[in-house]
């Protein structure tokens, strides 16, 4: 986490005090949660869905939260804090200190012979921090001790796993392990983040406003890795929580069953968890605040640099990645189309970026559809032209219709998928492309279906003297909720036109699909029926498919409808309502039930 720079007293679960530049501890104001911003936190680059689990989350023996080594003092304080949590004892008094920072913003380092093959990658990771902050990483020399007033330095070596101490923890060699499988740019940037004083982002006290921690999916004995701190013991410098921080856990860290251990409260942001591509703007802003990169006496009268920027020795603003302008006031714009959207309208159209033109390489788009509680969502693909692969491994559109936090079915090529129907009121569609070969993409329409399976008293009697069963309805004052089509099931229920008993809308095409248990049939009785009247039902009409392709050979409109019950041929029945551009009426209401024949 970028935030949590350790204190000199007890910190919730883990403590790591950082030393002030002068060597004196510097007390900071009491921390309060930063305000939540209306805009989304952004992370550089297109992120695939989901991110591969970061190597730094793989458990290292003796490490806390996978990749953080603790000093003896920190281990003792951590145990005391855990004991306090378990017993409910009042926390020991602690004051926020931003201590154990590296003095003068200079971090001496050595790269051991065991890591010589990784030296270019390690240097690139340090350059990334230098390019976006005022920190400087310098090869260790004999003069550093005299110039900086300490003997501390980072020592990169090829140890077991990926891990680092937090902040300036020793007055001597401080190791960072870049072991097997850890030699990736983002992983090394992450470990250096720990070394300069960052903790994991999901440890912040305000994390529950942004993420869900799913303890039921966490390995037994690993729950402490998901502990969070309190504002009385940590500081965020008022920088907003960032699910795209390079210091954030991925979605599946320490999973016991292959299911997520962390999800974002906004499902569209799940793909940002665990990114190891680059520092996020919020990472950069916090580092520059913590290390007081803008604290130059000669620039006291200069305008403040914004968005994590800081003044150089000439009092010009140095802007972090993603911003420019004299004061870093301008966000760098991109021509890449925005493709993270949330849909709540009852109907809509979703397309891949640039449709009907070709989508770009390296896209990662997330579309969330959410209806009212109790509703379902139907998604119909009308166009599909995506790079093909038997397992859709290259480019794909994925539909999550049951659990939006679990993998869904992937589609690619030119074959239109079947209609996708959600089991609840949410659906998540992601579209990803690799670095080569593109197509036109996809186009799909959706509709939110308000379920209208209001239960009615079972007062049906089947006559033994007639070939078609009839129904006698109970006289009730039930509330009827109409809809423009939908899927209906169960043993009995009710369907009605949109807005019933008020007039339905113009320009409708509503399809109602009623399906009961295999081996049974659907019986339908109209309670009310008033559509715009016309001799041949050319304007507004209702047609009925009794299943197995059998349709009634007439359209119904006006006030004319079958007086007897309609019975399906198979276990399903389909009703289609059509309205034109003018004149509407009350519509219809009908009850259905499953029967045995």
UniProtKB/Swiss-Prot annotation:
It is found in: Cytoplasm, Perinuclear region; Cytoplasm, Cell cortex; Secreted, Extracellular space. SUPFAM superfamilies: Metalloproteases ('zincins'), catalytic domain (SSF55486), Spermadhesin, CUB domain (SSF49854). InterPro entries: Astacin-like_dom, CUB_dom, EGF-like_dom, MetalloPept_cat_dom_sf, Peptidase_M12A, Peptidase_Metallo, SPAN/blastula_protease_10, Sperma_CUB_dom_sf. Its cofactor is Zn(2+). PANTHER family: DISCOIDIN, CUB, EGF, LAMININ , AND ZINC METALLOPROTEASE DOMAIN CONTAINING, METALLOENDOPEPTIDASE. Gene3D superfamilies: Collagenase (Catalytic Domain), Spermadhesin, CUB domain. Could be involved in the differentiation of ectodermal lineages and subsequent patterning of the embryo. This is Blastula protease 10. GO terms for cellular component: cell cortex; extracellular region; perinuclear region of cytoplasm. Residues 24-67 are annotated as: Disordered. Residues 339-449, 484-595 form the CUB domain. Its EC number is 3.4.24.-. Coiled coil: none annotated. Zn(2+) binds at residues 190, 194, 200. Binds 1 zinc ion per subunit. The active site is at 191. Keywords: Cleavage on pair of basic residues, Cytoplasm, Disulfide bond, EGF-like domain, Hydrolase, Metal-binding, Metalloprotease, Protease, Repeat, Secreted, Signal, Zinc, Zymogen. Disulfide bonds join 134-293, 162-182, 299-315, 305-317, 319-328, 339-365, 392-412, 484-510, 537-557. Residues 1-16 form the signal peptide.
């Amino acid at each position: 986490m970028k935030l949590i720079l350790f204190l000199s007293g007890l910190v919730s679960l883990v403590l790591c005090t950082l030393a002030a530049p002068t060597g004196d501890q510097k007390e900071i104001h009491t921390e309060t949660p930063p305000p939540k911003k209306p805009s989304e936190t952004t992370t550089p680059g297109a992120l695939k869905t989901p991110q591969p689990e970061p190597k730094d989350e793989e458990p290292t023996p003796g490490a806390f939260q996978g990749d953080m080594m603790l000093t003896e003092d920190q281990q003792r304080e951590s145990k005391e804090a855990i004991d306090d949590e378990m017993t409910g004892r009042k926390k020991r008094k602690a004051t926020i200190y931003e201590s154990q920072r590296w003095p003068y913003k200079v971090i001496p380092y050595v790269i051991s012979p065991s890591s010589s093959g990784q030296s270019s990658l390690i240097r690139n990771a340090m350059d990334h921090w230098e390019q976006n902050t005022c920190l400087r990483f310098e090869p260790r020399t004999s003069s550093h001790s005299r110039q900086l007033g300490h003997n501390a330095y980072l020592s990169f070596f090829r140890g077991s796993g990926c891990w680092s101490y937090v902040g300036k923890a020793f007055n001597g060699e401080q190791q960072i392990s870049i072991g097997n499988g850890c030699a990736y740019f983002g992983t090394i940037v992450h470990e250096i983040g720990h070394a300069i004083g960052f903790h994991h982002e999901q440890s912040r006290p305000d994390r529950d406003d942004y993420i869900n921690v799913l303890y039921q999916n966490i390995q037994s004995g690993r729950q402490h890795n998901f502990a969070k701190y309190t504002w009385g013991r940590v500081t965020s410098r008022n920088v907003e929580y960032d699910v795209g921080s390079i210091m954030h856990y991925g979605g599946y860290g320490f999973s016991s069953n292959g299911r997520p251990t962390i999800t974002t409260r906004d499902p569209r942001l799940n793909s940002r968890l665990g990114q190891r591509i680059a520092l996020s703007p919020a990472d950069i802003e916090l580092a520059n605040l913590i290390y007081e990169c803008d604290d130059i006496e000669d620039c006291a009268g200069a305008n403040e640099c914004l968005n994590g920027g800081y003044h150089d020795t000439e009092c010009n603003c140095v802007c972090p990645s993603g911003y420019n302008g004299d004061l870093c006031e301008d966000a760098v714009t991109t021509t890449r189309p925005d493709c993270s959207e949330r849909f709540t309208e009852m109907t809509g159209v979703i397309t891949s970026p640039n449709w009907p033109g070709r989508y770009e390489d390296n896209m990662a788009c997330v579309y969330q559809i959410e209806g009212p509680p109790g509703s379902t969502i139907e998604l119909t693909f009308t166009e599909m032209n995506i790079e093909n692969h038997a397992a859709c491994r290259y480019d794909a559109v994925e539909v999550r219709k049951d659990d939006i936090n679990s993998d869904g079915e992937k589609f690619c090529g030119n074959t239109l998928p079947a209609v996708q129907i959600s089991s609840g009121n949410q659906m998540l569609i992601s579209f990803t492309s690799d670095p080569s070969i593109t197509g036109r993409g996809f186009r799909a329409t959706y509709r939110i279906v308000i379920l209208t399976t209001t239960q009615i008293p079972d007062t049906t009697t089947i006559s033994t003297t007639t070939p078609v069963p009839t129904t006698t309805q109970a006289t009730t004052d039930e509330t009827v909720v109409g809809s423009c089509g939908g899927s209906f099931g169960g043993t009995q229920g009710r369907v009605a036109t949109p807005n019933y008993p008020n007039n339905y809308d113009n320009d409708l095409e509503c399809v109602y699909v009623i399906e009961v248990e295999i081996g049974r049939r659907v019986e339908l009785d109209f309670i009310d029926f008033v559509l715009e009247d016309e001799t041949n039902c050319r304007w507004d009409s209702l047609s009925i498919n009794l299943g197995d392709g059998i349709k009634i050979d007439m359209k119904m409109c006006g006030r004319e409808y079958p007086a007897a019950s309609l019975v399906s041929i198979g276990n399903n029945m389909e009703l289609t309502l059509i309205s034109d551009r003018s004149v509407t009426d009350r519509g219809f209401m009908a009850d259905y039930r499953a029967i045995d024949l």
